[in-house]
Amino acid sequence: MLRDLGGGLILRRATGADAEALAAFNADQIRFQDAPAPFVPLGVWTRDLLEGRHPTFTPDDGLIVEESGTGVIVSSMLLVSQTWEYGGTPVRVGQVELVGTRPEYRGRGLVRAQFEVLHEWSARRGDLLQVISGIPWFYRQFGYEMALPRGGGPRFARTDLVPPAPGAPLPFRVRPMRADDLPFVVELDDRSRRRLLVSVPRDEKLWRYELEGHTPGSGTRLELRMLETEGGERAGFIGHIPALWAGSAALTHYEVRPGLSWRGPWPAVHAYLTATGESYRARGDGAFTQIQLWHVGLEHPLYDAVRFTDRWRPFALYARIADLAAFLGKIGPALERRLAASPLAGHSGVLTLSNYREGVRLAFADGRLTEPAPWPLARDVVGQEFGQPSSDPRRPMVMCPGLTWLQLILGYRSLDQLQEAFPDCLVRTGEARALVNALFPRAPSDIWALL
């Protein structure tokens, strides 16, 4: 037992023996909105995690709140550690997942109590960033801000784009991915992630986990397919959800090797998705009405090669950075590369940022980040704050309300976009604006977390 929470409830670590009970709990409590039945794929995924199939998660990375008298689970969450990249720099991340509480126990602080423990675990592991894919607003209560993009790719009705006729000759074809494809896939995936600010690297071991490690029916399992030429030469790969998703055949990945047109394999992929969606309809998944690329993300080279006209609104991932100075120090190499490529190359000076409660100070010498450090805010400055130029160095150069500075640092919004959305996002000088724009431009990210 980690804590006695009172009221007949205790907080403890999960164990492998909890696999079946927690699988049933998560499938029931984390079902889709207004769904009449549990969402079984979340139960399968939970069982995979607690039975040791995941490459980094162990059962005692989970928390359970249970009734001390009956052992009935009433609340739970898990921590899945992994390594992501920010501008090519590795960063340790703790992803919080499968957060659920029985309705009769909600509003009693059980999630907050678990976060206190989980955040401590994550910090001890050296995780500088925590993320959650979660319901709207809720996790803002625990120090999280929506600051990484999620989804937003196009969709089209089956009648809008007609696929090639069955049996029509095509210059590319789709086949299952095999283990011997993985060196090619790793190289192509690494290349594709250069388009992105924040991404999740995978070596051959982790790609093999994605290919073979998930139990069929798991909510995190994808169907992975290779694209190849008529002569059998590898041309790229795709991924898709192995079921109809809101009536859609849902593409998640589309990558082609350098030197090939992004448009070239699309007719074969379109035909494959149409046939696959029909097979899912025939097995009882429901109506097959459209093909969607929401999970491919808001920005992708395919969208410049194939004309799509309709999109679902993107969502976002929550992010938490408890020690911003440490995080900025870790991503220092990426910041220095950006500065070197900007009009402020070789810059020397200081940038101070504030969220009106705390601050951080970045010092640069000849373009090198030398001193990222917490920067306590002065409480005795003279007069009101209007964000105007000042001779008082205790006034921060950039002020972002609340946790919106995470949107800036993680490339979710540019400084101009933040100022448009938040009137109290203030920049004191032109030099500060130029430096922030050089260090923290808006940049695309695509998060396929290791789950």
PLM features per residue range, with description:
Residues 146-170:
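Flexible glycine-/small-residue-enriched beta->alpha junction loops
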Residues 96-101, 107-120, 261-277:
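Conserved acetyl-CoA-binding loop-helix of GNAT-fold acetyltransferases
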Residues 70-76, 94, 232-237:
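Glycine-rich phosphate/pyrophosphate-binding loop shared by adenosine-nucleotide-utilizing enzymes
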Residues 1-20, 24-40, 44-47, 66, ...:
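Intrinsically disordered, low-complexity, positively biased terminal segments
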Residues 82-83:
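PAS-family sensory domains and close relatives that share small-molecule sensor folds
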Residues 124-128, 133-153, 296-315:
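Conserved active-site alpha-helix within GNAT-family acetyltransferase domains
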Residues 45-49, 53-63, 76-78, 88, ...:
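N-terminal, Lys/Arg-enriched amphipathic/low-complexity engagement segments
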